[in-house]
Amino acid sequence: MAFISGCSKKAEMGSPANSGIQSSNTFFQVDATTAGSITGAIRFTGKKPPRKRIDMSEDPACVAAHGGVAYDESLVVDAKGALANVFVYVEKGLEGKTFEASDVPVVIDQRGCWFRPRVLGVQTGQVLRVINSDPVTHNIHPMAEVNREWNHSQGPGDDPLIRKFIKPEVMIPIKCNIHSWMHAFVGVLPHPYFSVSKEDGSFEIRNLPPGTYTITVWQERLGVQHREITIARHASAVINFIYEGK
């Protein structure tokens, strides 16, 4: 098992669901007998910044969904310093390999007048399924620069929106044009090797071919960090990241 730890102070969308299909015999096949994994955790040190209260008064249904009180989620740190909603992915080391997109859709829900999840990943060509669980109308607007930008209103009980991203792009900010406090971020990658840190700061990337990789982490307020790690045959490695507060 390898172990690496680091720290730092800072650091085409909307295409039809059947586009970008590629012959299966061109895809790289991972050998399960030699594949490894990466696990780790993201932590925040220093003074924990206070979370700002969000004013949802423009929509009473949103206020009611939070019992009258809602707080900013751009930096979620628990009492032990665990940092949630950090996007973790393999940035370098997979060049020359083409991976088949998962046939399992990635779901983003508009629930409680938030996007859930706030941070997510999807492969190029993988279905993004957008649903609205709220009793109010929302508008999902991914502000892509490499992929095609789009926005679409979705009322209560409307059918899911089905979209795909065609090109890699990290990260694409998403907003709701109706509710100004609603934000999310999606990382689009040409491979399945990404994760999002949980509430306890942990993450895991599985089924990774042996090799040397650059692992990158992204947090919407704290920026990016990069670390290099080598995965041996059928081995696991641990890599931790620390963001330092002021």
What are these regions (language model features)?
Residues 7-246:
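Extracytoplasmic copper-binding redox domains, predominantly the cupredoxin/blue-copper superfamily
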Residues 1-5:
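Sec-dependent bacterial lipoprotein signal peptides
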